[in-house]
């Protein structure tokens, strides 16, 4: 990621994610009343009793948006573990039961590297991103799931851990 940041340093309108904030989102629930949190924690905890730890291998890059108007640069997996898809589906089922709507988009497991507001040199960006070697960048054992509360700030999102569940 540091090499990519150096190559794209002239692009001042890319907001790079702080390495401490890198995460994979299973379900974004948006504004949530405080009184819903205990029930969410209880239901997610019960659901996670059916899951075991697994490993994710982040070995490919991609963008959301189009080649001509990219919005997000991300790191994903060529072979997503079935355990992650099962975990995501069970998570959605919990939130269905609690009355939360599902996203309209399909689940694309990824970690966001940077959010792109605007590019000065689109062709150069396409060349750099198109030339990124597809190799194992991060191998991550998944031993816990964290329920975060996020706060949007001008400098980026700030995350507060509400509950950490071991699996």
Regions found by a protein language model. Give the residues of each.
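Histidine-dependent nucleotide/RNA phosphoesterase domain, centered on the 2H-phosphoesterase fold
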Residues: 1-167
